[in-house]
């Protein structure tokens, strides 16, 4: 068997940007999915050396905008929540139970993890006001959204794929 070395590459390459999807169910059993059409894993490798299998690995992907869309002045946030369960209350969606898919595109995405033990989906937004002299506070029509950073964090019961396909800035050398 060949000797394999995994190490940090020190660079973010085009192949580090992925299509990411989580598929699960609501408490009522309705299907729901969260998609990040282009995302990068900003998680740091954090592996615990333990004898027990109770340790649950956690990984986080952040959705990214594309230059192509921004050139067309398309600032649509890079995430989607869809499926019959998408209209249910936020409390009904169980991010801890489902499958986690990663690929270069939606068509070639394959399951890379079975999730359990929780997770989170958050869109971190920042806004600023355009204020004129003596405005007492925010004024309708003069609030601008600067950013929207969708982040999908999942805990995996079992990883079904190899480490270099998930983390950004990782390279593999086989001798």
Q: What is each residue range found by the language model?
A:
Residues 1-175:
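Signature of extracytoplasmic/envelope-associated structural regions
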